[in-house]
């Protein structure tokens, strides 16, 4: 038997992916399902959720779709109950739900916008983890992969609120990793830079996207599947000695 671990251990596991109906979340849900993980795809748009679930089940994977607002504790509690009843206890939690980093100048950013972004990107991560963490502690096993952004560490084309929220996710994840390692729970974080998705295509032209991609050492934008590949590694036993880290996915831009 090879001493190099693969992703075979993902087969038979149960994962919850919030923000799972589109972009990075959808790509991650599909990647997990392709390796035999049963996935709960969570989002707010029923049609988008059903499309992602369908793309999984059409290929023989196991997935269910759930509508939930991850800033509402009662909806997350219902999600936990429903997921447990339909798929079983959660082994892998990926709280990817959040807003976007649309550019907002700090001198025009309002308190209302600040609170909304912190709620959608940081508080939602905390509440989602809080809903599922007791189950993992009781089983002394679990993997949590959170979603930050390159904006947490770099001056970026986003907003101060978004940068602060995503930096908060990094700190929260590191704290969780330290606090719950003794319970057999690993916590790591992903920090992607510019990933081409529907949102980006809606507010940037093809030429603008090409110019942005050319600014990266690897001369292209990230794709949702690039981030999903890293999420898959962190979810599997291939990363069994990895916890408390933030993985930068930035096409080499962290070197600049």
Q: Which stretches of residues belong to each language-model region?
A:
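Alpha-helical segment proximal to the catalytic Tyr-Lys
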Residues: 134, 178-182, 240
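Active-site helix of classical SDR
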Residues: 129, 165, 173
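Substrate-binding pocket helix/loop in short-chain dehydrogenase/reductase
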Residues: 104-106, 110-118, 200, 212
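Active-site loop immediately N-terminal to the catalytic Tyr-X3-Lys motif
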Residues: 107, 154-160, 182-183, 219, ...
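Conserved glycine-rich cofactor-binding loop
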Residues: 14, 21-23
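Residue(s) in the substrate-gating loop at a strand-loop-helix junction
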Residues: 149
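Short C-terminal tail/terminal secondary-structure segment
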Residues: 2-7, 103, 154, 232, ...
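Catalytic Tyr-X3-Lys loop
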Residues: 110-126, 141, 145, 169, ...
